[in-house]
């Protein structure tokens, strides 16, 4: 009986997805070679892009991050959300 119970516990642990965390690109650069593990509760990868006007003219800005929810798009702001590892490249 103890062997059966132990077997069931082991099978349950193996079959469960214990502690999976999302991997997302997290940077403020145009290219982003590295990824980071998202904190608990943030299982969406986000890529935001917009054009910033500075003294040297317009420049495309991009920010990649982990998020709990997909933020809304706004005028002049493009938002891309996804739910697989490093999908916000």
Curated annotation (Swiss-Prot):
What terms describe the molecular function in GO for this protein?
Answer: toxin activity
Q: What stretch of residues is annotated with the motif Cell attachment site?
A: 54-56
Q: Name which cysteines form disulfide bonds.
A: 24-45, 27-32, 38-66, 70-81, 82-87
Which residues lie in coiled coils? none
Q: Where in the cell is it found?
A: Secreted
Return the SUPFAM superfamilies for the record. Snake toxin-like (SSF57302)
> What keywords would UniProt list here?
Cell adhesion impairing toxin, Disulfide bond, G-protein coupled acetylcholine receptor impairing toxin, G-protein coupled receptor impairing toxin, Hemostasis impairing toxin, Neurotoxin, Platelet aggregation inhibiting toxin, Secreted, Signal, Toxin
Identify the tissues in which this protein is expressed: Expressed by the venom gland.
- Please tell me where this protein is predominantly located: secreted
The residue range of the signal peptide is 1-21
Q: Name one GO cellular component term.
A: extracellular region
Q: What does this protein do?
A: Exhibits M2 muscarinic acetylcholine receptor (CHRM2)-blocking activity, but has a weak binding activity toward nicotinic AChR. Moreover, it inhibits collagen-induced platelet aggregation.
Q: Which family does it belong to?
A: Belongs to the three-finger toxin family. Ancestral subfamily. Orphan group V sub-subfamily.
Q: What is this protein called?
A: Gamma-bungarotoxin
